[in-house]
Amino acid sequence: MNIKELTYYIQSANINFLIGSGASRPYLATLGSIEKLLTRLNDDMTSHFEPKYKIAEASIYKAFYDSVIAPNRLYHKSGDDYSETKKNYQNYLITWNSLLNKRHSRILKKQLNTFTTNIDLMIEDAANGMGIELNDGFRGSINPIYDEANFMKSIMQTSIHFQHTSEIPVFNLLKIHGSINWSGYNNHIVHERFWSYYVDEEIKKMGDDRFVNLFNIGSDGRKTEKTYEQIIEGAEELELLYEASEYDAFITEYKKFIIVNPTKRKFAE
């Protein structure tokens, strides 16, 4: 495809992107083996429940929380990996904002749909302060509520001196696996300002030692992922020290996130 053909499609077609977890690298981890671990664990828990499985479940959730969810906290964001990831998202927004501004068609809106399976807040963070319209589907200021009708709106800009009206580019962000800052309230999805607080508190109460570490640490300091069998063995050892019910509060708070957890069942969800 040459530049002329590409220009034609940009000018005359609806523009949609689908981005996955790799877009938030290197700052946030990809799923790795977590999806396979949770899928197998869910199958075992469905066929016959044992306390060790609850401990393993909590441990895998914590590993996912530590690597993908917790780094989105405001005070956590720093370092070269964060800067690189944020810059990549900003380049995406700047480039397409410029292209949409140059769209000549009056039939098509100056909108771009970004569908993402990511539950993180990196693209929202990147857009903050850029002067770019990122529509995440929420309406309202004090207690924003998610409303899909929001994606059908256009934003117009009027010149102060000549009363000339023009449409400005809008990026619609559709998070098809949910988001870590979504919460349920009165049958609505609302913004949760303190999304990490309650899970963090449960982890502090329990301590890291009550969770199975999903990695083996070699003598050289290198980490290798544990197998499913090794994780279950670790859960069996913890079962001798702690009651499985002690993990209930953490699991309950974690499951309040309105997200599709990384298992093969996510395709059904």
Describe every region a protein language model picked out.
Residues M1-R139, N143, S166-P169, L174-H177, ...:
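Gly/serine-rich nucleotide phosphate-binding loop at the start of the catalytic core
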Residues Y89, A268-E269:
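A conditional alpha-helix N-cap/helix-loop micro-motif detector
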Residues L108-F267:
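Extended, H/D-rich, highly charged conserved domains that either
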